[in-house]
UniProtKB/Swiss-Prot annotation:
Keyword tags: ATP-binding, Kinase, Magnesium, Metal-binding, Nucleotide-binding, Phosphoprotein, Transferase
Protein name listed in UniProt: Polyphosphate kinase
Pfam short name (any one): PP_kinase_C_1
Gene3D superfamilies recorded: Endonuclease Chain A, Polyphosphate kinase middle domain, Polyphosphate kinase N-terminal domain
InterPro entries: PP_kinase, PP_kinase_C_1, PP_kinase_middle, PP_kinase_middle_dom_sf, PPK_C_dom2, PPK_N_dom, PPK_N_dom_sf
Gene designation: ppk
Superkingdom, taxonomy of origin: Bacteria
Alphabetical list of SUPFAM superfamilies matching this protein: Phospholipase D/nuclease (SSF56024), PHP14-like (SSF143724), PPK N-terminal domain-like (SSF140356)
Entry annotation: catalytic residues: H427 (phosphohistidine intermediate)
Length: 694
């Protein structure tokens, strides 16, 4: 099949539409503070998009690159389309923010500027300024002897226009840098938040004594945050990375956010020094630095304005009183997070660190929380003399510094730490424990779609798989040998790994379904679909009658509902949990269910070490089947992709199905039922039965 550029949706525009779906949660019947969270998430996402994707397009344009995507849009065309899209959507963001804050006021929760406070609260703000703000803020003069300062990425400041009271004709410009150690809002009372810049503005003349304030404007800068590291030339990769992190702070300016109706001379002053293209200047009639809205959303006095808190459940065959290794030795176990608890994953490593029969623990780490119990368990194991091998991916974007910290801590404890593979990121999520049983060695494995991160495990949907099967032991051992040693053979037998096998295996399974024509079925759930070869193979399958359902949270470059894709349906699910699992079903393959750390993107399939895991266990396959069925039935959180690249909400029928809420209810029902049943084998059977029935 010959493809053409018009058969693909532009990657960057597809991502923008994903983020629009995040913002669209503000239009739904959600608790107010949940809506505020979605605004924070939307703005955080946009920050990263500008730091990496827009910055990259600017570099391509500067280098004279004409085409950089499957749809053959040039970097300049993409930049123009992005700016147009975001300037239009800015008005929608402002609308939702004003609407939500207005509704919050009806609930007696306020964001108020200094000038709108009563005298008592103003006095409290004044006291807070002198005790907490004044000692740490940085007043900056800009003139012939004071050059324009370095502004960190995403730094928040107040630009000022002032004049000398003794010489009113001498207008000067400067700024007040607001350090990140200060909270975004001052909680002046239990229900009133004052933006920090509002207090600083009020006291600007005390910050610049002897000067009169003419105007001020809050602004925020975004820099290019991508890092290019010459790994092949690095003798000490950790040192090179630390240098790269320092250079990142000095990346080129790519965006300026500033309050609307700012003094024209202030805007000109900033533009002159930052040299930001005028279309990358965004003026807001609402507050800036909205990722910090989490501070308000976390107010303990207004939990009634949040969704009810769900507690993940641990289901059989896992049991508090049973060794996790005994459970895994009896059968393969699959859990779906965060509906089922992440605790067994932690217990897997914790128990291994304490078990005297365990001689080796191996693990990959990509994104780890700052206070990680899992990494602490690895440190304890290494300190006790166990052989601990940890692949810490130092190139995990925006987690580099945290990963550096843990890599050093593990190394100091005696663990063998691998920093990565030259030219690749290691994105696979896998751990292996080896125990002595008499004169034999027994292997236990955990493979996952998500990170070893207890914090994200509460808000990401992911799939974890525990097994002690020999074929998985063989392949995980080979995988860790590839990571720690030299190997030209990067192929496994049961597992598939990228960059050599996963794409090849996926294309092979698509071809099998294509050969079955209208009896073929493919269901694939992932974060993003970009790879043009896989998209072309799906088009060919569709034209042969294969029924294809794709559940893609984010980027999708495939165009559904065309002559060549009339049998392909694409949906995206956006809810309170971030859909992060990658689950694939190919009806006529054997096995036919897979989980993976990899999306169907060139970066995952060609430039990362990833794993795709076949699922053989019938109970686990039944769970995955139910999981996919629920998501394909969702008419509350789901959006459907149209052939013009736009997404439409799935029309609700009389029976509404929220796949995330339904799974919460299913697992809670199972848990409640099982609490009454003390027979372990019967309880496990009941858990499986309930998953199938529901």
């Amino acid at each position: 099949m010959q493809t053409s550029p018009d058969m693909f949706i532009n990657r960057e525009l597809s991502w923008l539409r994903f983020n629009s779906r995040v913002l669209d949660q503000c239009s739904k019947n959600l608790p107010l503070l949940e809506k505020l969270k979605f605004i924070a998430i939307y703005c955080t996402n946009l920050d990263e998009f500008y730091m990496i994707r827009v910055a990259g397009l600017k570099q391509l344009f500067s280098a004279g690159v004409n085409a950089s995507s499957s749809d053959e849009m040039t970097p300049l065309q993409q930049l123009k389309a992005i700016r147009k899209y975001l300037h239009q959507e800015k008005e929608l963001l402002e609308h939702y923010f004003n609407e939500i804050t207005s509704e919050l006021e009806k609930e007696n929760l306020f964001i108020k500027h200094y000038e709108n406070l009563d005298e008592n609260l103003k006095q409290k703000c004044d006291e807070y300024f002198f005790s907490n703000i004044f000692p740490v803020i940085v007043p900056i003069a800009v003139d012939a002897t004071h050059p324009f300062p370095h502004l960190n990425n995403l730094s928040f400041s107040l630009a000022v226009k002032i004049f000398d009271k003794a010489h009113p004709e001498l207008v000067k410009f400067g700024m007040i840098r607001i350090p990140r150690v200060l909270p975004r809002f001052y909680e002046v009372s239990a229900n009133i938040y004052v933006p920090i810049e509002s207090i600083v503005h009020q006291h600007a003349e005390e910050i610049f004594p002897g000067y009169k304030l003419l105007a001020s404007a809050a602004f925020r800068v975004t820099r290019n945050a991508d890092m290019v590291i010459e790994e092949e030339e690095a003798d000490d990769f950790m040192m090179i990375l630390e240098q790269g992190l320092k250079l990142r702070r000095k990346g080129a300016f790519v965006r300026l956010q500033i309050q609307k109706d700012a003094d024209e001379q202030i805007v000109e002053f900033l533009n002159t020094h930052m040299k930001i293209f005028h279309k990358d200047v965004y003026e807001y009639s609402i507050l800036l630095n909205l990722p910090s809205l989490w501070q308000i959303a976390g107010n303990k006095n207004f939990t009634h304005l949040l969704s009810p808190l769900y507690t993940p459940k641990t289901l059989p065959p896992f049991d508090e009183n049973l060794s996790i290794f005994d459970a895994v030795e009896k059968e393969d176990i699959l859990i779906i997070q965060p509906f089922e608890s992440f605790d067994p994953v932690y217990k897997f490593i914790k128990e291994a660190s304490k078990d005297p029969e365990v001689i080796s623990i191996r693990m990959t780490l990509y994104r780890v929380e700052k206070n990680s119990n899992i990494v602490q368990a690895l440190i304890d194991a290494a300190s006790d003399g166990k052989q601990v091998t940890v692949m810490v991916e130092l190139k995990a974007r925006f987690d580099e510094e945290n990963n550096l910290h843990w890599a050093k801590a593990l190394e100091n404890a005696g663990a063998h730490v691998i920093y990565g593979i030259t030219g690749f990121k290691v994105h696979a999520k896998v751990s292996q424990v080896i125990r002595k049983q008499g004169d034999k060695l027994k292997f236990y494995m955990h493979l996952s779609t998500g990170n070893y991160n207890a914090s994200s495990a509460k808000i990401y949907t992911d799939v974890s798989y525990f097994t002690s099967k020999a074929e998985f032991a063989r392949d995980t051992t080979s995988f860790f040998h590839i990571l720690s040693g030299f190997s030209k053979n990067r192929r496994l037998q049961t597992l598939s790994m990228s960059p050599n096998q996963i794409k090849e295996k996926i294309l092979e399974m698509i071809r099998i379904e294509t050969s079955k024509k209208n009896k073929g079925v493919i269901v694939a759930k992932m974060n993003s679909l970009v790879d043009s070869d896989i998209i072309q193979a799906l088009y060919e399958a569709s034209m042969e009658g294969v029924k294809i359902d794709l559940i893609i949270r984010g980027i999708c470059c495939l165009k559904p509902d065309e002559e060549y894709s009339k049998n392909i349906r694409v949906r995206s699910i956006i809810g309170k949990y971030l859909e992060h699992a990658r689950v694939f079903y190919f009806k006529h393959s054997e096995p036919n269910y897979f989980i993976s750390s990899a999306d169907w993107m060139p970066r995952n399939l060609e430039r990362r070490l990833e794993l795709m895991t076949p699922i053989y266990d019938e109970r686990s396959k039944a769970k995955l089947a139910q999981f996919l069925r629920l998501q394909l039935s969702d008419n509350v959180l789901a959006y459907e992709l149209k052939n013009n690249g736009e997404y439409e909400k799935i029309p609700s029928s009389e029976k509404t199905i929220d796949s995330q809420q339904t799974l919460e209810e299913y697992v809670s029902k199972i848990y409640k039922t099982l609490k009454k049943d003390t027979d372990q084998s019967r309880a496990t059977h009941l858990a499986s039965k309930l998953f199938k029935e529901n």
